[in-house]
Amino acid sequence: MASKGPSASASTENSSAGGPSGSSNGTGESGGQDSTFECNICLDTAKDAVISLCGHLFCWPCLHQWLETRPNRQVCPVCKAGISRDKVIPLYGRGSTGQQDPREKTPPRPQGQRPEPENRGGFQGFGFGDGGFQMSFGIGAFPFGIFATAFNINDGRPPPAVPGTPQYVDEQFLSRLFLFVALVIMFWLLIA
């Protein structure tokens, strides 16, 4: 029994290596086949295997993703030689599910996701980066955007606060404070 095991595995290797019998069910060979056909990107068994002109083996889904994420610089992930969809050759052999070109079936594009905007508290009208800064150009008292400002067109400011809210009270206080400061400056200009 001990001598029968090694000779059986040797005959299986001989028939799979050069014989026309085709497939074998030996577990020793599947381990060797897995190590022979490894993708150079995911380092797993190559599914829908393609080989580049420089001789490197890849899964087509892995290589497709590699090429899609680098559209301006399409190089081989291993040796940095030029590579594209047309410069790879599909491999057909044992273990392949069909004789269809793997380059014809591209992986589906993932759905886009739009996150909800963040709600920022406090005064949103101050600062240059948040859209609170507004500028209009004009000559003298006639700004070019007079109609846009008169009819509130393309205005990025938030709506006024509802009377009775703490924001409304704060805005009224600031308005009165700035009016008082303006009156003091005008009075100082008159007496100076």
Curated annotation (Swiss-Prot):
Its main location: mitochondrion. GO terms for molecular function: protein-containing complex binding; ubiquitin binding; ubiquitin protein ligase activity; ubiquitin-like protein conjugating enzyme binding; zinc ion binding. Residues 1-130 are cytoplasmic. Residues 15-27 have a biased composition (Low complexity). Disulfide bonds: none annotated. The RING-type zinc finger domain is responsible for E3 ubiquitin ligase activity. PANTHER family: E3 UBIQUITIN-PROTEIN LIGASE RNF5-RELATED (PTHR12313). This is E3 ubiquitin-protein ligase RNF185. The gene is Rnf185.
